[in-house]
Amino acid sequence: MESVLNNEKAIVVFSGGQDSTTCLFYAKKHFKEVELVTFNYGQRHDTEIEVAKQIAQDQGMKHHVLDMSLLSQLTPNALTQHDMEITNNEDGIPNTFVPARNLLFLSFAGALAYQIGAKHIITGVCETDFSGYPDCRDSFIKSMNVTLSLAMDKDFVIHTPLMWLNKAETWKLSDELEVLDYIRTKTLTCYNGIIGDGCGECPACHLRQRGLNQYLESKGAL
């Protein structure tokens, strides 16, 4: 299967974070041609867009940045509101959840894939370290794959290489791709906008660091 994929084109939904950057290198390994798409939806930190641009430049990859600022107008959430504290809502879903974000992102990624002739769409969503985001579920992705293909009469394939990996396993994958140190130092996962190991205090940093420690312990590197 890999040899077939190597002759095809893919687009990666790319934020400059650990997961999507791991997907970038996964795509580079498995596809002949890869482009990136980043969505500017009014994130708390402009740094996220700049990090994505820098990584794309480092890797010499064509990078599309699309304006999705409408998202921040639809609903208040801690990913777009600078003065909102990050907490869990009554239903257990963190207030970092942006309703319909992945629905819209994959729709626009599909439209772009159609225009550039890419059959494959790669996204870093994951159920294993599940924050409660309903649009990260495997069932949603499978449904979206069918919807995009029907909507544009194209046989798209949405790939989720991290879907069943926990954070330690995601670090393992990056190590197998020989980019662990690059991802550790160059990506932005921190909700407080600090590149690399981050602030060490926010939920995203805790999850990332715990996974890294677990992986390094498993290989005897700590």
Swiss-Prot record:
Database matches in Gene3D superfamilies: HUPs (3.40.50.620)
Reaction(s) catalysed (UniProt annotation): 7-carboxy-7-deazaguanine + NH4(+) + ATP = 7-cyano-7-deazaguanine + ADP + phosphate + H2O + H(+)
Binding site for ATP: F14, S15, G16, G17, Q18, D19, S20, T21, T22, C23, L24
Positions contributing to Zn(2+) binding: C190, C199, C202, C205
Subunit-level organization: Homodimer.
The family this protein is said to belong to: Belongs to the QueC family.
Listed name of the protein: 7-cyano-7-deazaguanine synthase
Organism: Staphylococcus aureus (strain NCTC 8325 / PS 47)
Top-level taxonomy: Bacteria, Bacillati, Bacillota, Bacilli, Bacillales
Gene name as annotated: queC
